UniProtKB/Swiss-Prot annotation:
Pfam families associated with the record: Ribosomal_L29
SUPFAM superfamilies in alphabetical order: Ribosomal protein L29 (L29p)
Gene this chain is encoded by: rpmC
Protein's name in the database: Large ribosomal subunit protein uL29
Membership in a protein family: Belongs to the universal ribosomal protein uL29 family.
Superkingdom per UniProt: Bacteria
Species whose genome carries this gene: Buchnera aphidicola subsp. Cinara cedri (strain Cc)
GO molecular function: structural constituent of ribosome
Record InterPro entries: Ribosomal_uL29, Ribosomal_uL29_sf
Keywords: Ribonucleoprotein, Ribosomal protein
Signal peptide from the UniProt entry: none
GO cellular component: ribonucleoprotein complex; ribosome
Length: 65
C-alpha cells in the first residue's frame, strides 16, 4: 500500500494497521536476536511501513490544528 492509498484510509483503520505492524516488528526483532530470521529485509520494510503510517497520522493531526 503506497502513501496515497494510506491518505484515503480512515484514522481508526490506520491505527489498527500501526498496532499490527508494531506487533510484527516486535516478533521480527525477537527472531533476529535469536538468529532464526531468514528474511532480514523484513526489518527495514516493517520500519518504513510504520514510518509511513505515522507520517499520515501526524499530517492529519497537524492539518486539523
Amino acid at each position: 500500500m503506497n502513501i496515497i492509498e494510506k491518505n484515503n484510509i480512515d484514522k481508526n483503520h490506520l491505527k489498527k494497521n500501526l498496532l499490527d505492524l508494531l506487533k510484527e516488528q516486535f516478533n521480527i526483532r525477537l527472531q533476529l536476536s535469536s538468529g532464526k530470521l531468514k528474511k532480514t529485509h523484513l526489518v527495514k520494510k516493517n520500519k518504513k511501513d510504520i514510518a509511513r503510517i505515522k507520517t499520515v497520522l501526524n499530517k492529519r493531526i497537524n492539518h486539523t490544528l
